[in-house]
């Protein structure tokens, strides 16, 4: 097993390397009859695309996506391109590789990168931009996430950068409307202005910063997830940890919950509308016992500082000789910025998988168990969010 796939019923396989001819993904298990065109996928890829500001890598990749399979359109569909229920293959060509930038490290391991571990495992490594361990691999995840969102009617998934290096946002100023107004996906306008100054200094020094990203899914129905080894939060944690450069994940209050007393941490309930309880808080991040509560699902993950920096660092060569390394090439001074849409995509893929798994195990949701207008269990042949022509 090569471990390049994740998910059970909504299954995603990614392929390709940073400096190869192309990368992409195959999504297997997407229900049929869902309208899908390349423009919808492209819109998500454009949010992650490199070279859009001075605060990201200046590698110029258009990330133009092609749908190779799994969709069909003719006069019977009214000209609409629909999913067919077969594997959806997506491809994104690499067009701005500069592999010569990496020739001086072909026989040297970069500290903080996966150079040594890949070679220790496989006996060979693609040193050009890190190969498959590069953050470029995440473009394929974002493409898959765009399809996953189509399986989640009534669910809104949003992400934000809430900390850069030691500089956190002020929660009192958290405003989702600000996320699209700055190059950091930051929900705090004042923090974004400070971060620009900080990151300019870091770039000038040839260094980098880490970050914390928060992803929130609203409209998630109760009942997703299965005890004990199919917990929703366990799958979310695994999905976020699989993103290159991620070093920590928390759900809800996460590690901060350890500092609370029991009466502070428990999310009290009162009678709500439609027979469902109303929660007075959401310390649990929308998941209890590994099963969604119907509240917003809240996940945060920490991204380490980019290891590709201009500061010389001690390392060794392939034949175990001491050397110093500095990394040339084009790199993100804070890779966490472009990790925001990646986190959203992984949230979408995990939720889509759990929606389909729930439907397969218990059928439709109990009455009132999902928001009005949502069809997470799929009540028509087209499945969740599907389109039934005619």
Curated annotation (Swiss-Prot):
GO CC entries: cytosol
UniProt entry keywords in alphabetical sequence: Amino-acid biosynthesis, Aromatic amino acid biosynthesis, FAD, Flavoprotein, FMN, Lyase, NADP
GO BP, sorted A to Z: amino acid biosynthetic process; aromatic amino acid family biosynthetic process; chorismate biosynthetic process
Biased segments, Low complexity type: 363-379
Domain of life assignment: Bacteria
Catalytic activity, as annotated: 5-O-(1-carboxyvinyl)-3-phosphoshikimate = chorismate + phosphate
Molecular function terms, GO-annotated: chorismate synthase activity; FMN binding
Cofactor note: Reduced FMN (FMNH(2)).
Gene3D superfamilies: Chorismate synthase AroC (3.60.150.10)
Annotated binding of NADP(+), by residue: 48, 54
EC number: 4.2.3.5
Known cofactor(s): FMNH2
UniProt-annotated stretches for the region Disordered: 362-390
Composition skew (Gly residues), residue ranges: 380-390
Binding site for FMN: 132-134, 244-245, 289, 304-308, 330
Subunit structure: Homotetramer.
UniProt cross-references to HAMAP family, sorted A to Z: Chorismate_synth
Family of this protein: Belongs to the chorismate synthase family.
Function comment: This reaction introduces a second double bond into the aromatic ring system.
Name recorded for this polypeptide: Chorismate synthase
């Amino acid at each position: 097993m090569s471990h390049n796939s994740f998910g059970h019923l909504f299954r995603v396989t990614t392929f390709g390397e940073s400096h190869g001819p192309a990368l992409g993904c195959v999504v297997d298990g997407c229900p049929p009859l869902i309208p899908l065109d390349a423009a919808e996928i492209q819109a998500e890829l454009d949010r992650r695309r490199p070279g859009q500001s001075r605060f990201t890598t200046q590698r110029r990749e258009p990330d133009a996506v092609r749908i190779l399979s799994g969709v069909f359109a003719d006069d019977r569909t009214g000209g609409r391109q629909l999913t067919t229920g077969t594997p959806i293959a997506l491809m994104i060509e690499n067009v701005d590789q500069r592999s010569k930038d990496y020739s001086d490290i072909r026989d040297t391991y970069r500290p903080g990168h996966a150079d040594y571990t890949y070679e220790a495992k496989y006996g060979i490594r693609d040193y050009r931009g890190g190969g498959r361990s590069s953050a470029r691999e995440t473009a394929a995840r974002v493409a898959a996430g765009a399809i996953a969102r189509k399986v989640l009617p009534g669910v809104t998934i949003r992400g934000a950068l809430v900390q850069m290096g030691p500089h956190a946002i002020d929660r009192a100023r958290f405003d989702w409307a600000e996320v699209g107004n700055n190059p950091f996906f930051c929900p705090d306008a004042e923090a974004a202005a400070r971060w620009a100054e900080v990151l300019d200094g870091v770039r000038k020094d040839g260094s980098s910063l880490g970050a914390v990203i928060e992803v929130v899914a609203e409209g998630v129905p109760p009942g997703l997830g299965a005890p004990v080894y199919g917990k929703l939060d366990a799958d979310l944690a695994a999905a976020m940890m699989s993103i290159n450069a991620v070093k920590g994940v928390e759900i809800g209050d996460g590690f901060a919950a350890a500092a609370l007393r029991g009466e502070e941490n428990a999310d009290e309930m009162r009678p709500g509308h439609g027979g469902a309880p109303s929660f007075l808080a959401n310390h649990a991040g929308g998941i209890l016992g590994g099963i969604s509560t119907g509240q917003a699902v809240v996940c945060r993950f920490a991204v380490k500082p980019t290891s590709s920096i201009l500061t010389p660092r001690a390392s060794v060569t392939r034949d175990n000789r001491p050397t110093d390394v500095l990394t040339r090439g084009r790199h993100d001074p804070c890779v966490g910025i472009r990790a925001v849409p990646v986190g959203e995509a992984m949230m979408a893929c995990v939720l889509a998988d759990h929606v389909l798994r729930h439907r397969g195990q218990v059928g439709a949701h109990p009455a009132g168990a999902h928001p009005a207008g949502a069809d997470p269990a799929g009540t028509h042949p087209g499945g969740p969010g599907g389109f039934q022509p005619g």
